[in-house]
């Protein structure tokens, strides 16, 4: 019972930081110019600049919005979406001890796991922004280059709160638990050290990165209807692979997807 209460508190703490307001300005599209790309709409002054040189300052600006978001809850705003996500996460956490043993025992996903291994999914996630940037450089297309730069910013901005939360929760991965072990006693037990980047932890870092990148491409190329479906479909496969590989529980993946999407959609692409 105490473990369940801790799970809900952790989920509430994370989601209260990372469910930014939906009442944001519309998504801006950049002008096709040389130098640092700007984000604007016709007839409006530039809203921001994006470049590799500005990446650190942009990430710091994003972090300010992420970590100050709980202040909006104190003023009575955004309680409905935050509460909904907290309850959804708590429900998945309660189901984790029942779903994890199935993926430990089944051999159904052996081939799937070989294809979407740890290293292969990293390569898959890196391929899209690297390709976009390379094509943009060759074609002198600042929009394509900015897409890659925004993807890098989105991943960094979402992974920072994810890493902090992983260090606080210190959750074991399903693979750390013996086949007949207790899949409920997973919180505050990992001894993998601060800022650990490997398997395990709440939330899933792979899923955070996958949905951050997917959201950038899905929104910046949303007029091509196949792009959002492909981007989120591939991100979903990356997240699912973390479960089948026994690297994460389903709740880790769910919160990773929420975190990657919300930080990218409501903060990185909205200012």
Question: What do the predicted segments below correspond to?
Answer:
Residues 81-82, 135-161, 165, 228:
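Interfacial segments of alpha-helical transmembrane regions
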Residues 18-120, 125-139, 174-200, 271:
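N-terminal targeting leaders of membrane proteins
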Residues 94, 158-179:
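Transmembrane alpha-helix/helix-exit interface in multi-pass inner-membrane proteins
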Residues 82-86, 90, 126-129, 151, ...:
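Alpha-helical transmembrane spans of integral membrane proteins, capturing the lipid-embedded, hydrophobic core
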Residues 1-9, 119-120:
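Bacterial N-terminal signal peptides that target proteins for export
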Residues 63, 87, 165, 206, ...:
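Divalent metal-coordination and catalytic microenvironments
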Residues 9-18:
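Bacterial N-terminal signal peptides
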Residues 179-271:
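Membrane-embedded catalytic cores of phosphoryl/pyrophosphoryl-handling enzymes
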């Amino acid at each position: 019972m105490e473990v369940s209460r801790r799970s809900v508190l952790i989920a509430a703490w994370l989601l209260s930081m990372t469910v930014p307001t939906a009442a944001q300005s519309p998504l801006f599209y950049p002008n096709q110019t040389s130098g640092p790309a700007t984000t604007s709409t016709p007839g409006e002054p530039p809203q921001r600049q994006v470049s590799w040189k500005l990446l650190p300052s942009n990430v710091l600006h994003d972090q300010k919005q992420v970590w100050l978001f709980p202040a909006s809850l104190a003023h009575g705003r955004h309680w409905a979406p935050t509460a909904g996500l907290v309850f959804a996460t708590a429900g998945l956490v309660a189901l984790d001890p029942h779903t994890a043993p199935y993926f430990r025992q089944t051999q159904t996903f052996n081939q799937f796991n070989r294809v979407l291994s740890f290293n292969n999914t990293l390569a898959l996630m890196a391929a899209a922004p690297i390709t976009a940037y390379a094509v943009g450089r060759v074609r002198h297309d600042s929009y394509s280059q900015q897409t890659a730069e925004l993807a890098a910013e989105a991943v960094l901005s979402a992974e920072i709160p994810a890493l902090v939360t992983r260090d606080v929760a210190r959750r074991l991965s399903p693979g750390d638990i013996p086949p007949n072990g207790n899949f409920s006693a997973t919180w505050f037990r990992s001894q993998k050290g601060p800022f650990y980047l490997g398997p395990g932890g709440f939330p899933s870092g792979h899923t955070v990165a996958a949905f951050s990148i997917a959201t950038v491409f899905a929104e910046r190329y949303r007029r091509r209807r196949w792009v959002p479906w492909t981007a989120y479909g591939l991100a979903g496969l990356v997240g699912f692979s973390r479960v089948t590989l026994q690297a994460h529980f389903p709740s880790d993946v769910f919160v990773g997807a929420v975190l990657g999407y919300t930080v990218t959609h409501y903060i990185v692409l909205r200012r």
